[in-house]
């Protein structure tokens, strides 16, 4: 399940809600599961019918990150909803799963998108990250920066992950548009497609608070015990978000 985003930053693009339909904005391929990050399948409604599923990314042995709009329809137990971004933390059994560390991404960096495809297998798309913007006409991103990339995604990948070249989780997939778009000042990004994720760096304080509350432990203790929770990610200051107009 994947939602598209409607914004005044996007010009002359037909938008569709992706509830009960199948949309693809570019080529993906099956992931090499021997070295790909672990991605979980989340059934929504009737599995494999009309895109009736989402994805999640293991965070700890007990918790995963996914899209909020997926978590609201999935059968998993929700630990926390982000108050303004399309992200949620849910309970899942992630023992023996590969836990990708959380990380950062910079403009023009190469990224990969991972999620569960129509066949129930993990798929991957490749592209680059451009910038963060405000989608002022979107309920999902009215108060949350939208990170723009051109890596392809499709229905079912919502809640899956965006990863940098180091294999670090830099965002949770939220939505798509089929074409590039212009900023309000008329500049064109030159992107063939528009895929959107929520940056893990932007929500790192919420992630830390949610994990601490769940385990009843402070972050320093958790960092020492959980490979995906690194001091480099959680202790460095989060940069101020300056959305492009």
Where are these regions (language model features)?
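Flexible, gly/ser-rich surface segments that form the specificity/activation loops bordering the active-site cleft
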Residues: 97-158, 173-184
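C-terminal cap/linker of serine protease catalytic domains
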Residues: 24-31, 97-98, 174-245
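Extracytoplasmic
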Residues: 51-53, 61, 73, 83-87, ...
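A conserved glycine-rich beta-strand in the N-terminal activation segment of trypsin-fold
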Residues: 35-67, 71-81
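Bacterial N-terminal signal peptides that target proteins for export
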Residues: 1-9
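Terminal peptide-recognition signature
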Residues: 56, 62, 66, 90, ...
């Amino acid at each position: 399940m994947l939602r598209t985003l409607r914004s005044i930053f996007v010009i002359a693009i037909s938008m569709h809600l992706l509830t009960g339909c199948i949309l693809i904005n570019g080529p993906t391929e099956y992931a090499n599961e021997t070295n790909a990050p672990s991605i979980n399948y989340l059934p929504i409604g009737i599995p494999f019918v009309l895109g009736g599923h989402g994805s999640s990314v293991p965070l700890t042995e007990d918790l995963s990150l996914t899209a909020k709009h997926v978590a609201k329809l999935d059968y998993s137990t929700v630990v926390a909803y982000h108050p303004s971004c399309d992200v949620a933390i849910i309970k899942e059994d992630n023992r023996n799963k590969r836990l990708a560390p959380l990380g950062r991404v910079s403009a023009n960096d190469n990224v990969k998108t991972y999620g569960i495809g129509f066949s129930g297998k993990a798929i991957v798309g490749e592209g680059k990250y451009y910038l963060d913007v405000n989608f002022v006409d979107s309920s999902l991103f009215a108060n949350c920066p939208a990170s723009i990339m051109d890596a392809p995604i499709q229905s079912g990948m919502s809640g899956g992950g965006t990863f940098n070249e180091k294999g670090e989780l830099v965002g949770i997939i939220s939505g798509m548009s089929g074409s590039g778009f212009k900023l309000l000042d008329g500049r064109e990004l030159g992107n063939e497609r528009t895929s959107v994720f929520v940056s893990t760096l932007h929500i790192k304080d919420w992630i830390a608070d949610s994990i601490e509350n769940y385990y009843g432990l402070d972050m320093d203790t958790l960092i020492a015990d959980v490979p995906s929770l690194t001091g480099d990610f959680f202790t460095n200051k989060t940069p101020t978000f300056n959305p492009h107009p």
